[in-house]
């Protein structure tokens, strides 16, 4: 019985370790802005509130996307998405790659993130 309990415990510890290793580290926007070269083209996570959002979504087509600004209380960052944009005021967590010179619709938004995944809180 003790061997089975140890095996189950070891399996759970390994599973938790793998799950946390697969998740990007959550960073403050101020930390990213203070040292952008450290995060450039790296997968990171940010969380905060959507302050602005501009999107395009044409019904009955696959055409959608846009840009939205996330504010975490330390700063704000533009996020480019190929999905529909979240509404202003939405609490959100975003995983993506930090890019310099994020462009959308012909306008440069400076340091930003290209969204890979998001969670609405």
Locate the predicted segments by residue:
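Sec-dependent bacterial lipoprotein signal peptides
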Residues: 1-23
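OB-fold and OB-like single-stranded nucleic-acid-recognition modules
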Residues: 19-121
């Amino acid at each position: 019985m003790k061997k089975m309990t140890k095996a189950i415990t070891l399996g759970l510890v390994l599973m938790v370790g793998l799950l946390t290793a697969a998740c990007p580290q959550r960073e403050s926007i101020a930390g990213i802005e203070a040292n952008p070269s450290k995060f450039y083209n790296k997968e990171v996570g940010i969380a905060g509130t959507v302050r602005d959002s501009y999107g395009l979504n044409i019904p009955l087509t696959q055409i959608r996307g846009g840009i939205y600004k996330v504010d975490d209380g330390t700063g704000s960052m533009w996020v480019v998405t190929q999905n529909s944009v979240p509404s202003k005021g939405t609490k959100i967590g975003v995983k993506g790659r930090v890019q310099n010179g994020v462009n959308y619709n012909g306008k440069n938004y400076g340091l930003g993130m290209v969204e890979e995944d998001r969670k609405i809180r």
